[in-house]
């Protein structure tokens, strides 16, 4: 059998970031993987994934596969195990996540993810509309990676994100919240939040905030609209989640109510409670 380290960990190494974890893809079936290692946990046999426990941690090992039709805007209804690494990489979301490495065979990069890393580009693998229709959370993931890596999103990929963003209606609050939190905790949260507004995606994330864009404050101490001021505050506060959430919401009542202080606190409380922050 052959195996490759794959995905975000390879991307991070090539960029110069220490990976948080490592994923492995292999030609071995889940049953064969379990027979090869002493301690394994069948964490996702339906999709070909087995957790292999070693002396230095656990690693998700997944059989090469092709995905069938997606259900619930998240998972394929069925998968087909294959013996071709390229077919496995073809199903992945963006090119910089579709790079594999084997110590003997080196880098496998059929979709030029390394080139996109060099040019700092976020680009969907294959048909971008299909990629985002399969799992609309990939739209937020593209924004998050663009924010955290300071990469630009390729034009066709960006157009597909806008065309398919209605699929975010079917994504759970928990998954959306995780991506938003990662954007807020990045080195440039204002970039990510601005992108969510500019593309119209924020109406699926925190629709209550949409009125901040374009709302002028008519105050000599504020030369920006509410959104512009909020983004400036986000840029200057520490990378602490409660602090950055407070910065995001601190003027959210201005564009909706006259009694700003009261309604700002009520809006923030209701949004945070509903979203389980």
Briefly describe each language-model feature range.
Residues 1-277:
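Catalytic cores of the polymerase beta-like nucleotidyltransferase superfamily
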């Amino acid at each position: 059998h052959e195996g490759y380290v794959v995905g975000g960990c390879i991307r991070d190494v090539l960029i110069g970031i220490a990976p948080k974890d490592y994923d492995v893809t292999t030609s071995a079936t889940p049953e064969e993987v379990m027979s090869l290692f002493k301690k394994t946990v069948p964490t996702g046999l339906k999709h070909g994934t087995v957790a292999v426990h070693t002396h230095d941690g656990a690693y998700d090992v997944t059989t090469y596969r092709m995905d069938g039709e997606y259900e619930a805007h998240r998972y394929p209804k069925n998968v087909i195990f294959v013996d071709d690494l390229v077919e496995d990489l073809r199903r992945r979301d963006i090119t910089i996540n579709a790079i594999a490495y084997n110590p003997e065979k080196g880098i496998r990069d059929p979709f030029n993810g390394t080139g996109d890393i060099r040019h700092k580009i976020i680009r969907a693998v294959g048909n971008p509309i299909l990629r985002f229709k399969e799992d609309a959370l990939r739209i937020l993931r593209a924004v998050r990676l663009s924010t955290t890596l300071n990469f630009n999103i390729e034009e066709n990929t960006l157009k597909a994100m806008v065309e398919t963003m209605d699929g975010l209606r079917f994504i759970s609050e928990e998954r959306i919240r995780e991506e938003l939190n990662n954007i807020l905790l990045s080195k440039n949260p204002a970039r990510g939040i601005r992108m969510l507004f500019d593309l119209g995606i924020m109406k699926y994330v925190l629709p209550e905030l949409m009125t901040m864009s374009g709302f002028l404050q008519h105050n000599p101490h504020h030369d920006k609209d509410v959104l512009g001021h909020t983004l400036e505050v986000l840029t200057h506060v520490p990378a602490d989640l409660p602090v950055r959430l407070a910065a995001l919401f601190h003027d959210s009542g201005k564009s909706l109510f006259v009694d700003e202080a009261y309604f700002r606190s009520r809006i923030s409380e209701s949004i945070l409670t509903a979203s389980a922050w």
